[in-house]
Amino acid sequence: MAASADLSKSSPTPNGIPSSDPASDAMDPFHACSILKQLKTMYDEGQLTDIVVEVDHGKTFSCHRNVLAAISPYFRSMFTSGLTESTQKEVRIVGVEAESMDLVLNYAYTSRVILTEANVQALFTAASIFQIPSIQDQCAKYMISHLDPQNSIGVFIFADHYGHQELGDRSKEYIRKKFLCVTKEQEFLQLTKDQLISILDSDDLNVDREEHVYESIIRWFEHEQNEREVHLPEIFAKCIRFPLMEDTFIEKIPPQFAQAIAKSCVEKGPSNTNGCTQRLGMTASEMIICFDAAHKHSGKKQTVPCLDIVTGRVFKLCKPPNDLREVGILVSPDNDIYIAGGYRPSSSEVSIDHKAENDFWMYDHSTNRWLSKPSLLRARIGCKLVYCCGKMYAIGGRVYEGDGRNSLKSVECYDSRENCWTTVCAMPVAMEFHNAVEYKEKIYVLQGEFFLFYEPQKDYWGFLTPMTVPRIQGLAAVYKDSIYYIAGTCGNHQRMFTVEAYDIELNKWTRKKDFPCDQSINPYLKLVLFQNKLHLFVRATQVTVEEHVFRTSRKNSLYQYDDIADQWMKVYETPDRLWDLGRHFECAVAKLYPQCLQKVL
């Protein structure tokens, strides 16, 4: 009887055998993908399609109502509203290109969409009509990643038309950052009055003189003088910060614009000229940035000090992500800072073989953070980054793979418009601890007995006359049409402070006076071009004995080169031991914005 009672509590199964197992919610993780794949197959083969969509130029697409309704509120309303279209076998859509409709349908059946500069705006328009925000956001993300001085105004106008907040904000941010380049473009003249004001009325405008803002307004006005003259007083009132302009410039303003300025002052009312906020670009200061520097109070963690030599102030820049070391560093002609490759420090004190990384990052000045960019095709430590012919090149370096340490021949090129890396012709010889510079659309690479040049247009490497004293781990920079190569290590591992200059036009090396340096201070040097002059940043270590105890002290100094007298002069010494510099520290020079950095001293 008891057994019968137990059986009565069991759950019946399809074959009649009772089961005491609890119910389970089984799920096939591939079910949704499988259905989508089958729907795509039926779409491609025209099976069970029940609606034909006609777009511009009479192009038609046979598809499934339920799929269209599932991804688009526009189609769902069309097919379920009870209106004429809900029963028609064919519907016509106005304002959608055939390629855009094909891309929308491909997204509906596969969740994928292929974007190009040629199709992205038309696809965004179609997604706007069909109310598919996921496609709009993908298009916006693509346009943001492909902003440049030539297209940024057009993208901003496009975003403003469709009311896409992020695309509008990011394109406007880019325009302000690259303002002087952007205002030269023809699209700048197409801005409406309100769009122009929204760009110019900002503290974040990257101009070093307020006169640039005034000149951009005049250029915009002269494009359509009759229609735009009435707007000048309002634009001047909202956008020009006259206290920041030179009196001599204001005095030369033509009477026509002076009258508009007078009206603008009436519209604006009285203001406190002493409290006029400077634009972001007016606060920029050229600084020397030291990478691979460890703060003396934080163990071995890296910090990135920035030295304002003119004012004596010291700031701190956001350290590279993942504490990357021995990265390739580049400051572009547009003052963008890039780092690539490197390695992440090991937790092991005895580990010397580091895993190479393929990271690529760009520094965002306004937020003091690093933005991720497409990874290198080849991981590499200590590569050299060079800007040439509008593109960036990652050259050589080393990895720890297979049988140990290997130098690299490989070279890759980054195109910011395409936002991707491509492989180019490798160097004839593998190189690490090398140097690379650019001059007149050619790249020059130096290491020991090898001196190479690269022509990007021909994708070709060639050999040049090597330096008279072959050295590795030296320092190179272009100065006054010559490549200076300073210091380094010769074949017997002896450190040298030889200075040579290569006249690029004459293909000739000339010895200069050695850099005066005492070997006993164990110096490490870095060569930079600061304020258009050649400088050496020197880390010196002195060891003293006090009461039978060895003590070390370090000094970081800056020496300026006088090419007429052929001599070096100390012009700056850093504050005493704010940080320590490792042997592999690197220096770069860029214009930075103090209010965006953390002040140290």
Curated annotation (Swiss-Prot):
One of its GO terms (biological process) is protein monoubiquitination. One of its GO terms (molecular function) is ubiquitin-like ligase-substrate adaptor activity. Residues 7-22 have a biased composition (Polar residues). GO terms for cellular component: Cul3-RING ubiquitin ligase complex; cytoplasm; cytosol; Golgi apparatus; spindle. Residues 153-252 form the BACK domain. PROSITE patterns: BTB. It holds the Pfam family BACK. Belongs to the KBTBD8 family. This is Kelch repeat and BTB domain-containing protein 8.
